[in-house]
Amino acid sequence: MIEAAAYILIGGQSRRFGSPKWKARIGNETVLNRILYSCKEFETQQLVGKYRPSKYKVPFIQDKHKIQAPIIGLHTALQQSKHDWNLIISCDLPLMTNSIMDRLWGKRKTGSDVIIPVVNDMLQTTCAFYHRKLLDLCKAGIQNNMLSLNDLVRASTYIEVDFSDQTDAFLNMNTKEDLVSIKKKLL
């Protein structure tokens, strides 16, 4: 069991994708179901977004900010969380696995604020553990219109975890073409 909360970001306008990404299907399951399965070891799982998805019994937190940015979802999650550590994961990572979650969780250290995967020298900010003590820094970023999660991470004490051996798990699904490519990886 991972003694943390998993917050799945389902918001976003999905302009390039054309419809809510969490509804996209891979085989006989939705992308959201795949993400929920990858988070099955967490004490709690919650969805964060503008609108509650129908047909899901997973607890939902409505994001009330008008701004569309992952830092808004992080802020909403940290405000609600009763856990010190909180996974923030975007619903556009349909190849994510629970073994990656376990590996990340195993790297936490006292005094750190963020445990973050790195793939091809890029921080994977929408699949990382954030400590609840970042709430004030997150709030200040939003108030100052500094909405970059990369900037937030770099302003904190963070642990990088190299996932160059599992780059496919971090393939981001932004377009229908991305979805086709991801489906091909599963064949």
Model-derived regions, located:
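Nucleotide and nucleotide-moiety/phosphate-recognizing core
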Residues: 1-146, 151-170, 176-177, 183-187
